[in-house]
Each structure stands twice: as structure tokens, then as C-alpha cells.
């Protein structure tokens, strides 16, 4: 074949090859552009979701709860032990929506603090060896089901700056009770959490309350002794934190332990021996969570309080009748630490002093003397 005949064929093949390369390049470019658009849309969705939930909480809880005030040593009802009170408690305190395919945000913590909540429950995970707050509906240490997380350092900073300030909390001198449920076995994360707590030494309880208060029941201490302080409670469902001595210095109490129980609401509602639970809660404490699920209803505070349970953890983003009743209960009490009724508090059994003996009835040796004799009988 002549050279002149080959050139058109070669040119055609070259053109086809170039077209294929251009087509592949366009496909790759289009795919990259599609991914970028998806990422931008995802970021916009998350931003709008966070903004929507924060706006919702702000609309409901934007102002300070004027019905709640700080405990005071001038009120005799504030002079009892910690376990003799109901605590106003928020469940998953950084959550403003459901626990799956949703977001967490620090704005939700600020909102519940404005309402006077002093019991704060968190679910803590490990990301890049750092403790973070998120939520999930599965009992798995490797899965969080929220799109984002909140660093625990931001949680502590918010507690320091908002929980103890009169402009952001109506009861700013009341103690804060932090309850943590760990979803990790990462010891490096636990060490980093200990380092974080160390930077808040002045806010936390002293060394006499380290290592679970050295086996003593912190609930048996006077409520007023914890004013302006943070009490740390870890849940023993995951005991990995017990291996970290540095962190144990900051653990004042544990739930699912001898001094404190943890229940889902179902287990309180269907408890076969409520009288035993009432007796237990007279000297110890219990925390009650909503039942499992991505968007559960709140516990019935009336039933849980009747069982003597001190911390009935509420979902403040779920405005149902149970939340409204719980809010009304603490508003009427005017404290976030509301004294339990007398029949649900421990009263030690005392034995009255013995009647003094009549010396005339004594069997001791005595002397009998007359003008005629003297002898001992």
C-alpha cells in the first residue's frame, strides 16, 4: 500500500484514539465534579440541619428559666444529702435531634443549661485518640451514627463558662453532675481525657473524692458541700476506664455499681419489686434513661420519681407531655435539686436511751447498820 493511502487511515486511527482519550478525560472530570457537588451539598445539608436544630432549641429555650434558682444554705430544704434529691437531668445533652443520621451541637448544651439542668449525660467516643461526644442506636464501640461530633474539651469549656455564670444559667452556683457513657476501649483517649480534666482542677472535686471516693458513697455527702463544683460519674457498662489510673483520679462515682444503678425506663416501669428499688434509692442513687431507639419518647418522671430515682434523664428536644410535666415539677419546686418526700428518704432506726436504773433496786453490796449491828448484804 502506498504512503498516500496509509496517511488517511493513520489519521483516522489517531483521531479515534484522541476522541477516546478526550472521552475518558471528560468522564473522569465529570465524576470528580459530581463528587465535589455531592460534598458541597452534604456540607450545606449538615450546616442547615445544625442551624435548624439550634434554632429550634433557641426558640423554645432561648431565655433563662426564671422559675429555677440556686440552692441556698438559708433554706432548710437544701440541707440534706445528695441522694435525697431529684436532679434536673438532660440525656445526651449535646443532641438536638434523633440519635441516628443526625447531628450534635454545643448549642443544645447551652440551651439545657439555660433551663437549669444540672445533671448532664453524654455518650463519649474516641476519634483520633481524642474524647468526643456523639450518639448512636447500636451498642458498638466503633460506630457512631451522627454525622459529626463535639469535642469533650468544648463541652468542658462550655460548662465552665456557661454553667457557672448568672447570665447563662439561672442556678449558676449549683453543682453540675456529669454522667458519661463510654463507647471506646482506647486507653490513649482515656489518658487525653485525664489531661483535659487536669486543666479544670479548680472546678472538680478534691483528691478526697478520687478513685470513686475511695469506696465511699458520694451520695451520702451534703448537697451544699458541692456548690460551684462538678461531680464526675462514669458508667460501668464499659469498664475500660478503670485501667487508667490517671483518669481514675477524677472519678467521683460510677453508675451500674453498688452505690448507683442505671436503668432504661422500660426496666423501671416493669420492675417486679418497686419497693426494693425505693429502699435502695433511700441510701443510694439511680439514673433513668429513655428507652433505646433513634427517637424515643421521654421517661415518665412521675413513675420514676415515685420509685425514688434521683436522675430522670430527659430529651429536651422531644417536647412531649412527659417533658412538660417534668419541667413543671422542677419549676414548682423552684430548684434543680428538689428534695424527695420524707417517705422516700432514709431515716435511720434509732433506739431510745435506756431508762436510768433505780439505785434502790441495785444488787450491789450495801451496808446495813443499826445501834446493835453492822454488816454487808
Task: Tell what function each PLM region has.
Residues 2-119, 126-205, 209-377:
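Long, acidic (Asp/Glu-rich), low-complexity accessory segments flanking structured domains
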Amino acid at each position: 500500500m502506498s504512503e498516500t493511502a496509509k496517511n488517511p487511515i493513520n489519521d483516522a486511527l489517531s483521531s479515534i484514539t484522541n476522541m477516546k482519550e478526550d472521552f475518558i478525560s471528560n468522564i473522569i472530570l465529570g465524576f470528580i465534579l459530581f463528587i465535589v457537588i455531592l460534598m458541597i451539598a452534604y456540607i450545606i445539608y449538615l450546616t442547615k440541619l445544625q442551624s435548624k436544630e439550634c434554632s429550634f432549641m433557641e426558640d423554645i429555650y432561648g431565655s433563662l428559666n426564671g422559675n429555677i434558682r440556686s440552692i441556698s444554705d438559708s433554706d432548710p430544704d437544701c440541707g440534706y444529702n445528695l441522694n435525697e434529691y431529684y436532679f434536673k437531668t438532660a440525656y445526651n445533652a449535646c443532641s438536638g435531634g434523633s440519635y441516628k443520621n443526625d447531628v450534635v451541637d454545643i448549642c443544645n448544651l447551652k440551651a439545657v443549661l439555660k433551663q437549669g439542668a444540672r445533671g448532664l449525660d453524654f455518650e463519649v467516643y474516641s476519634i483520633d485518640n481524642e474524647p468526643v461526644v456523639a450518639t448512636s442506636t447500636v451498642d458498638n464501640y466503633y460506630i457512631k451514627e451522627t454525622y459529626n461530633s463535639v469535642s469533650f474539651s468544648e463541652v468542658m469549656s462550655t460548662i465552665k463558662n456557661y454553667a457557672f455564670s448568672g447570665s447563662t444559667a439561672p442556678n449558676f452556683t449549683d453543682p453540675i453532675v456529669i454522667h458519661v457513657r463510654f463507647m471506646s476501649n482506647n486507653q490513649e483517649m482515656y489518658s487525653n481525657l485525664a489531661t483535659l480534666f487536669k486543666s479544670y482542677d479548680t472546678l472538680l472535686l478534691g483528691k478526697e473524692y478520687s478513685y470513686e471516693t475511695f469506696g465511699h458513697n458520694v451520695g451520702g455527702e451534703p448537697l451544699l458541700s458541692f456548690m460551684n463544683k462538678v461531680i464526675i460519674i462514669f458508667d460501668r457498662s464499659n469498664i475500660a476506664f478503670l485501667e487508667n489510673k490517671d483518669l481514675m483520679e477524677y472519678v467521683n462515682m460510677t453508675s451500674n455499681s453498688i452505690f448507683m444503678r442505671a436503668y432504661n425506663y422500660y426496666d423501671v416501669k416493669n420492675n417486679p419489686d418497686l419497693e426494693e428499688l425505693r429502699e435502695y434509692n433511700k441510701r443510694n442513687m439511680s439514673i433513668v434513661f429513655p428507652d433505646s431507639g433513634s427517637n424515643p419518647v421521654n421517661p415518665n418522671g412521675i413513675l420514676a420519681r415515685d420509685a425514688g430515682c434521683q436522675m430522670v434523664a430527659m430529651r429536651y428536644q422531644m417536647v412531649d407531655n412527659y417533658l412538660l410535666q417534668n419541667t413543671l415539677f422542677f419549676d414548682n419546686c423552684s430548684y434543680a435539686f428538689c428534695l424527695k418526700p420524707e417517705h422516700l428518704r432514709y431515716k435511720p432506726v434509732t433506739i431510745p436511751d435506756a431508762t436510768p436504773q433505780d439505785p434502790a433496786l441495785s444488787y450491789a453490796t450495801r451496808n446495813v447498820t443499826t445501834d446493835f449491828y453492822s454488816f454487808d448484804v
